[in-house]
């Protein structure tokens, strides 16, 4: 039995083919249009929590999709480590199966990305992942190549013993990156995440849940020079522009850490109303060692997260009203180590002399949005949304005191209209228009150390702060055409074209454009 379940899930996720069929959320013989699939995904409240055991309460119908996407971004309105030009091609497949004794969902994504005119980062696959201790170069424009693999699945039981459900979510990521200009970098990031959980039905309308969160991650960064005749400078970052300047081949850096956390959920539902709340907390400890042969502990981060999510849906025959909110507070201590080399024959290596907290990083993220959906059969006729995403950064280097602060909000208004082009082949044209406005409320970078001449202080950090404190406005337009590939089947093919631009009037920046083309099928 287990073998058959795994085989069917594998087929669904990797090949995008749904082995079993469901009619409850489909127009008979028409499958899912693009709008219908969006509507299905938009109603999965438990899916957006850390608890896979709640899958049964989402009542998601079976579906599968397979799509290919090409995405291109260009323009100088971006954060300091982001490349000015990015080209990305990816293949993505996703499937949901209700097999009676088990509910299963999975996704797989492979992404190949080329970057041009990327500056400073000379160490990490993703310099924005929350790790402040890494290496940068002198800011010369460079090319990067990325290959990313992402696999995630959820498996859960239906209700057992009249009240209980059990589930687990697992995620595996492998990200490979290579910098194409001296000093060159080969960076490899791996992450495994496990999230077991359970739910308990208190009454016919109330459900509580609890889940655990464990993450093991590792990144290896290996610098090298192809032109040994030219010795280039590099900078080992220790927070807010504070850096140690080096010259030559660079260094090998080993990052490894674990995250532990837990989450609690509560749901109340009736025929016309459903609200789900989640409270979560976790802690990450990640070590930074230099060299693989004779490791020297250089730094460590201790990160704590505390947050909540609330999803509220009100249903009627014609409309769905949704109000969603989230909040996350992240506090990170940056710890540096002082070590001494021990060259004795018995214990060659490094001796730790002292370590202390030298920098702190605090991030506050909050979101609030409202979505109104006008229903039409198993899809929607139109959908409107408004929302705001807020982020506050408060970073401090303790001695000598330096700081970097900013408060930003992105406001948006979204409208989608699902036009019926034809009925025999389920032809649909989905129009999606979004207006965006970025507002910076405050921000400042103030370095008070002794090395004002370093490029990390003169240019790198001020450029990043300039982006964070710059206002902008923009728009996004996308068109998705979908139809049945053959009559009397439920296989819909679709093509999506999307364009967006974010424009700033600041002297330092101009704009950022994004063009995307997607081809896919769903069942």
Name each model feature, range by range:
Residues 29-31, 204, 511-523:
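Outer-membrane beta-barrel "beta-signal"
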Residues 91-97, 151-157, 194-200, 262-268, ...:
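Residues on the lipid-exposed face of transmembrane beta-strands in outer-membrane beta-barrel proteins
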């Amino acid at each position: 039995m287990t073998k058959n379940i795994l085989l069917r899930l594998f087929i669904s996720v990797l090949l995008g083919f749904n082995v079993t069929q469901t009619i409850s959320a489909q127009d008979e013989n028409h499958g899912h249009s693009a709008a219908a699939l969006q509507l299905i995904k938009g109603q999965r409240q438990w899916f957006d929590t850390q608890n896979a055991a709640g899958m049964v309460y989402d009542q998601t119908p079976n579906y599968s999709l397979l799509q290919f996407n090409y995405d291109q971004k260009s323009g100088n309105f971006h954060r300091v480590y982001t490349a000015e030009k990015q080209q990305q091609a990816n293949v993505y497949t996703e499937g949901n199966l209700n097999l009676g004794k088990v509910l299963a969902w999975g996704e797989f994504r492979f992404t190949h990305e080329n970057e041009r005119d990327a500056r400073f980062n000379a160490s990490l696959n993703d310099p924005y992942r929350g790790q402040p201790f890494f290496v940068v170069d002198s800011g010369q424009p460079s090319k990067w190549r990325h290959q990313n693999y992402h696999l995630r699945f959820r498996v859960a039981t239906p209700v057992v013993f009249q009240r209980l459900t059990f589930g687990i979510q697992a995620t595996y990521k492998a990200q490979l990156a290579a910098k194409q200009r001296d000093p060159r970098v080969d960076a490899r990031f791996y992450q495994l995440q496990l999230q077991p959980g359970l739910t308990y039905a208190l009454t016919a309308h109330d459900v509580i849940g609890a889940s655990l969160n464990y993450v093991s991650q590792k990144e290896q960064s290996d610098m090298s020079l192809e032109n040994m005749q030219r010795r280039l400078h590099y900078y080992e970052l220790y927070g807010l522009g504070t850096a140690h300047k080096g010259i030559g081949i660079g260094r090998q850096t080993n990052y490894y850490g674990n995250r532990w956390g837990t989450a609690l959920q509560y749901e109340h539902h009736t025929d016309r109303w459903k609200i789900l709340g989640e409270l979560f907390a976790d802690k990450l400890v990640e070590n930074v060692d230099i060299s693989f042969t004779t490791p020297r502990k250089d730094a460590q981060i201790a990160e704590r997260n505390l947050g909540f999510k609330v999803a509220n849906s009100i249903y009627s025959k014609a409309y769905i009203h949704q109000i969603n909110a989230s909040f996350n507070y992240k506090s990170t201590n940056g710890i540096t180590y002082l070590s001494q080399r021990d060259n004795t024959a018995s214990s060659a290596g490094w001796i730790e002399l002292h370590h202390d907290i030298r920098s702190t990083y605090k991030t506050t993220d909050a979101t609030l949005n409202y979505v109104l959906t006008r229903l039409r059969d198993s899809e929607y006729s139109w959908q409107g949304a408004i929302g705001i995403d807020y982020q506050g950064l408060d970073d401090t280097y303790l001695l000598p005191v330096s700081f970097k602060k900013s408060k930003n909000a992105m406001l948006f208004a979204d409208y989608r209209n699902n036009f019926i082009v034809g009925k025999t082949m389920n032809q649909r044209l989905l129009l999606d228009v979004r207006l965006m406005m970025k507002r910076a409320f405050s921000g400042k970078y103030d370095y008070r150390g002794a090395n004002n001449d370093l490029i990390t202080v003169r240019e790198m950090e001020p450029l990043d702060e300039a982006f964070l404190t710059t206002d902008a406005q923009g728009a996004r337009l996308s068109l998705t055409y979908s139809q049945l590939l053959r009559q009397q089947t439920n296989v819909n093919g679709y093509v999506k074209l999307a364009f967006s631009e974010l424009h700033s009037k600041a002297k330092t920046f101009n704009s950022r454009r994004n063009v995307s083309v997607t081809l896919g099928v769903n069942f």
